[in-house]
Amino acid sequence: LAGLPGRYNSYVGIQKEQKDSIDMLVLGDSESMTSISPMELWKSVGITSYICGQSGQRISESYYMLKHALDYQSPQVVLLETNMLSRYTNTPDSLRSSISDTAMYYFPVLQYHNLWKNIVNDQIPEGWQSYKGFAIRPGVAPYSKGSYMKKTKKEKEIPQINLWYLDKIRKLC
């Protein structure tokens, strides 16, 4: 949605789609919105999809984005990009972010105060372009310099708050 600040695109965009027209919703951080092309999915296999991800999306944001999207869509598949599971530890800042995300869901005026006229009046912002949540990045090329990941036996626990939201997402699905 050109003309909207980045974090608002998916929130407003999903409600502009025809009701129950999306087969697959994608949630996650920037990898979700730059790696999966709804136009290519439609062209190659006939699946309608919408990317509800955003840069640095926290799992709590994914949960509330999914809740919002399900008010407008009944997808057959929800794809969850999992980078966010290992991010944010069990710290006061993480808890504060979670509380903030909850407040913004139940009181959207807190986060979307600049968009209230478009949302209430069901107006499409000037300059609107729909790429179904996909972020077009010209000049991006695949990495071709060999393996960049090292095999290790180290394990990292997923923070409890992230597991809690993951379970809430599972239950919503």
Write out the residue ranges for each language-model feature:
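N-terminal secretory targeting modules
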Residues: 1-23
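Conserved phosphate-coordination/catalytic loops
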Residues: 2-6, 60, 156-164
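Secreted/periplasmic serine-hydrolase-like ester/acetyl group-modifying domain
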Residues: 93-172
